[in-house]
């Protein structure tokens, strides 16, 4: 097999974008045309759906799929390795694009899995409402707090209607009309109550498993306690409680207001307040990212002919197999459409959560709630009649119920719209604030490990940071949330769908189909012969599973057990003589199969220490022929695993992995980038708004008016991105064609924002009131956190300053932008405006054989945690596959200008 140095024209074959007919032999072109009616060869994007109707001698040729059983399996601690023997018979061609791994096993998503918001138990109960219970008083005294709805005469033997006190009276039964107990006397009544020995928990979220088939919950003897109304002078019992101990649990709630240990069993313990555990969807990653082990320090994958034993798989440390697959799918299909077979459900976020469009609440009309009787308050009355000029009591045909309400109907008001919006902001924004803006409530002990679900549950956001009055009237993302991963959220619809594919229980069995993504073999036509096909699959739950909260699933008890892996594959549905003709021509090295990696880029990660704003990087001297440009973004170190290891012990996180799945969200933190070659070339030239060799991305102070679109992005950078993504520049700005404006493109994700702030320098009476001293809705909300019990009394609000009306204070305008998912791109061309075509003329000075070193300097916003600069150097990453003889497969990897691999040496 020839090496790249012997065939230099390969370096530029793909730059010119030749049609396949220009470099395939005339015989193969003719073959493709002759068979196009039922089999499209094209550029190896095939849809083989029509089986031939003649010259088929065995039923095997018409089978749509064949199952290959592994010849070797190794179930290790961190990986599951499997090996297959692919036997491709004569007159057949195996379609590697149709192959997938069929994996079965069991999954324990751990106790942190919660696939819903709120609670499943007593969700209608007030958060601090108590269960019917007995509780301790002073000394050995026992107190009672209970509701008795079950009517019936009480004797010393209990209630007549109660025949089995292990479940009767049932707590869900009582009078069916509002009349009973108000207009009509209810009489004696009974109910169930928890003994004082059962721990105190609010009714909201409380659950006790049944201990008999009738639904009773007692774990011991049921005891009766009798009561009478204190005002009654007789010695008859008016109420009866059947008290019991139960196995009280809170499967999906926790306490946010907890009293000290010495008060739990007393009266103060009745006022503890519960909140639901945070939702945490857990499922396999989009397209099973991370499951297949694409090693970066050797070969974990093998495709080798048994005759030659040369491995066709050469994965390089800086290749982007997973990210390439994500962007390739976006170019081919609509990523918003889900495809359950490959677990394709792209990570997304709610736009209204990332950027809050706070246009207030439409609460012009008050909302009332009324008593069930529809009138009141009712007063006991005595009927009167006229007697001459006076009144006297009327006892003629007058019943005992005489109740009248004075004035308007009694009502209570609630601002439904304001509460709904406040609840939306709390659940979707405030709870996802960085941990520095949260606190642990009194008497609650938070775990030491901040990556655990238990820790994330107990932490509460401080009040007034996110509320209905913050940035009211503006479309603005809270500044502290800009650097928080928006895809780690329970409104990530793709993750929710993938979690639901596995069901709604912690323990589940799975049966999944995993496609091959490695570019050199995922579209290969495998000719007759016997081949060894081997791959490893990760078992690290943090890598293969994804959670809404990004908690450490290893610590939180998740685990996976792979039981079997089979391989399914299809042969092309061709007549034998047709297949043998195709084989004969593909054996000719003129018709070698060439595959280009979709991104065709070498990636490099450069650490950015915490609070760093300047990062220089250097690339040693090399020939830049065939170089296409740079793409770059910023990712967090804690969200980036070491891909070279099957198990990274420092990867204590399970949220989205931008490095692999393109959930980038820190692009807005770049300020400028300079690019300097060690040559005299002033690249990219002086034909832009700003100085050569420098790209200014955003300006906080824009005295010259260089910013664009009511944001702080510069016109120059906007121009560069429009040209790089859509080739829209001097011909005027307009919306790009839909096939270019995909999910990861620039314009679809560019979000400019603007708001006004108080001009503190020109407003003499401005007071910088700290968050703890700001009050708004005092008496109707908690000063600590939205979840806490409300406190205070009605009073005029002291925050925020009015920005509108006759008393509007002086303001300054603040601008910014977000551009999630998108990689910033700088195309490479010495004539900067000729980005659409890469020509020898345009890159003449840098195409010379002399090598050039490259220095780049990135200026970024400071962040309080370590991050990584993720740079993609866009090269030509091409594999050329040659199958000269039966059972022999040879691959040459060409990578200009960064590195080359050769599977034949």
From Swiss-Prot:
Its main location: virion. Induction: Expressed in the late phase of the viral replicative cycle. The modification N-acetylalanine is found at residue 2. It comes from the Viruses. One of its GO terms (cellular component) is host cell. Gene3D superfamilies: Adenovirus Type 2 Hexon, domain 4, Hexon Major Viral Coat Protein, domain 2, Hexon Major Viral Coat Protein, domain 3. The keyword Phosphoprotein applies. InterPro entries: Adenovirus_Pll_hexon_C (IPR016108), Adenovirus_Pll_hexon_N (IPR016107), Adenovirus_Pll_hexon_sub2 (IPR044942), Adenovirus_Pll_hexon_sub3 (IPR016110), ADV_hexon (IPR037542), VP_dsDNA_II (IPR016112). The record marks 729 as: Involved in interaction with pre-protein VI. All late proteins expressed from the major late promoter are produced by alternative splicing and alternative polyadenylation of the same gene giving rise to non-overlapping ORFs. A leader sequence is present in the N-terminus of all these mRNAs and is recognized by the viral shutoff protein to provide expression although conventional translation via ribosome scanning from the cap has been shut off in the host cell. This is Hexon protein. It comes from Canine adenovirus serotype 1 (strain CLL).
């Amino acid at each position: 097999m020839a090496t790249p140095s012997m065939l230099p024209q390969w370096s530029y074959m793909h730059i010119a974008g030749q049609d396949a007919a220009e470099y395939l032999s005339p015989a193969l072109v003719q073959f493709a045309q002759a068979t196009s009616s039922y089999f499209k060869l094209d550029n190896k994007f095939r849809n083989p759906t029509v089986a031939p109707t003649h010259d088929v001698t065995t039923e095997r040729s018409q089978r749509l799929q064949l199952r290959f059983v592994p010849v070797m399996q190794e179930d290790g601690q961190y990986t599951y390795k499997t090996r297959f023997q692919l036997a491709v018979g004569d007159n057949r061609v195996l379609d590697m694009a149709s192959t997938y791994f069929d994996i079965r096993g069991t999954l324990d998503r751990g106790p942190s899995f919660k696939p819903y918001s709120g609670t499943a138990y007593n969700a209608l109960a007030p958060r601090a409402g108590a269960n019917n219970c007995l509780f301790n008083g002073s000394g050995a005294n026992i107190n009672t707090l209970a509701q008795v709805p079950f009517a019936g005469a009480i004797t010393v033997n209990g209630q007549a209607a109660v025949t089995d006190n292990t479940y009767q009276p049932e707590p869900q039964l009582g009078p069916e009309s509002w009349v009973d107990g108000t207009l009509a006397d209810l009489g004696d009544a009974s109910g169930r109550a928890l003994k004082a020995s059962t721990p105190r928990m609010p009714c909201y979220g409380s659950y006790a498993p049944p201990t008999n088939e009738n639904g009773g919950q007692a774990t011991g003897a049921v005891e009766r306690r009798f009561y009478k109304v204190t005002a009654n002078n007789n010695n008859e019992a008016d109420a009866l409680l059947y008290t019991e101990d139960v196995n009280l649990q809170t499967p999906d709630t926790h306490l946010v207001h907890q009293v000290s240990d010495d008060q739990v069993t007393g009266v103060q313990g009745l006022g503890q307040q519960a909140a639901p555990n945070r939702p945490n969807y857990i499922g396999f990653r989009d397209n099973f990212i991370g499951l297949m082990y694409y090693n970066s320090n050797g070969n974990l994958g093998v495709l080798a002919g048994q005759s030659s034993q040369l491995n066709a798989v050469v994965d390089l440390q800086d290749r982007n197999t997973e990210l390439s697959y994500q962007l390739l799918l976006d170019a081919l299909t609509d990523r918003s459409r889900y495809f359950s077979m490959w677990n394709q459900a792209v990570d997304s976020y709610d736009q209204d959560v990332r950027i809050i469009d706070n246009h207030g609440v439409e609460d012009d009309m008050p909302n009332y709630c009324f008593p069930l009787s529809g009138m009141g308050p009712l007063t006991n009355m005595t009927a009167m009649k006229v007697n001459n000029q006076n009144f006297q009591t009327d006892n003629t045909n007058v019943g005992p119920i005489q109740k009248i309400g004075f004035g308007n109907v009694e009502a209570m008001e609630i601002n439904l719209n304001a509460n709904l919006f406040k609840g939306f902001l709390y659940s979707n924004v405030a709870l996802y604030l960085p941990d520095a803006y949260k606190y642990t409530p009194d008497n609650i002990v938070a775990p030491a490990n901040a990556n655990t679900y238990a820790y994330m549950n107990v932490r509460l956001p401080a009040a007034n940071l996110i509320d209905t009055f913050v940035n009211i009237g503006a479309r603005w993302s809270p500044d502290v949330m800009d650097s928080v991963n928006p895809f780690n959220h329970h409104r990530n619809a793709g993750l929710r769908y993938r979690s639901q594919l596995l069901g709604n229980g912690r323990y589940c069995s799975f049966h999944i189909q995993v496609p091959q993504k490695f570019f050199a073999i995922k579209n290969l036509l495998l000719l007759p012969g016997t081949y060894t096909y081997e791959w490893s699959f990760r078992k690290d739950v943090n890598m293969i599973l994804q959670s809404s909260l990004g908690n450490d699933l290893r610590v939180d008890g998740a685990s996976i057990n792979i039981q079997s892996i089979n391989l399914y594959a299809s042969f092309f549905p061709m007549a034998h003589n047709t297949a043998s003709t195709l084989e004969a021509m593909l054996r000719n090295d003129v018709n070698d199969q060439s595959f280009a990696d979709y991104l065709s880029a070498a990636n490099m990660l450069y650490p950015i220490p915490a609070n760093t704003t300047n990062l220089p990087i250097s690339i040693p001297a090399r020939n830049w022929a065939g170089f296409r440009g740079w793409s770059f973004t910023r990712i967090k170190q804690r969200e980036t695993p070491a891909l070279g290891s099957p198990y990274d012990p420092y990867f204590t996180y399970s949220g989205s992995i931008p490095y692999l799945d393109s959930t980038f969200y820190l692009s807005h933190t770049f300020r400028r980038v300079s690019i300097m070659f060690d040559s005299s070339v002033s690249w990219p030239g002086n034909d832009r708004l700003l100085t050569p060799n420098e790209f200014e991305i955003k300006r906080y102070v824009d005295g010259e008016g260089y910013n664009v679109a009511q944001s702080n992005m510069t016109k120059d950078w906007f121009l560069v991105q429009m040209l790089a993504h859509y080739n829209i520049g001097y011909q005027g700005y307009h919306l790009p064609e839909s096939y270019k404006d995909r999910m990861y493109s620039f314009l679809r994700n560019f979000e400019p924002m603007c708001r006004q702030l108080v001009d503190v320098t020109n407003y003499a009476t401005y007071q910088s009131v700290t968050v703890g001293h700001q009050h708004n809705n005092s008496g109707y909300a908690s000063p600590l956190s939205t979840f806490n019990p409300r406190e205070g009394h009605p009073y005029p609000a002291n925050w925020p300053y009015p920005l509108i009306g006759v008393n509007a204070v002086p303001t300054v305008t603040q601008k910014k932008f977000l551009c999630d998912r998108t990689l910033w791109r700088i195309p490479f061309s010495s004539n900067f405006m000729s980005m659409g075509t890469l020509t020898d003329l345009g890159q003449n000075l840098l195409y010379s054989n002399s090598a050039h070193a490259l220095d780049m300097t990135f200026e970024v916003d400071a962040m309080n945690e370590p991050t990584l600069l993720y740079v993609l150097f866009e090269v030509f990453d091409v594999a050329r596959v040659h199958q000269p003889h039966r059972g022999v497969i040879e691959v040459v990897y060409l990578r200009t200008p960064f590195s080359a691999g050769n599977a034949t040496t």
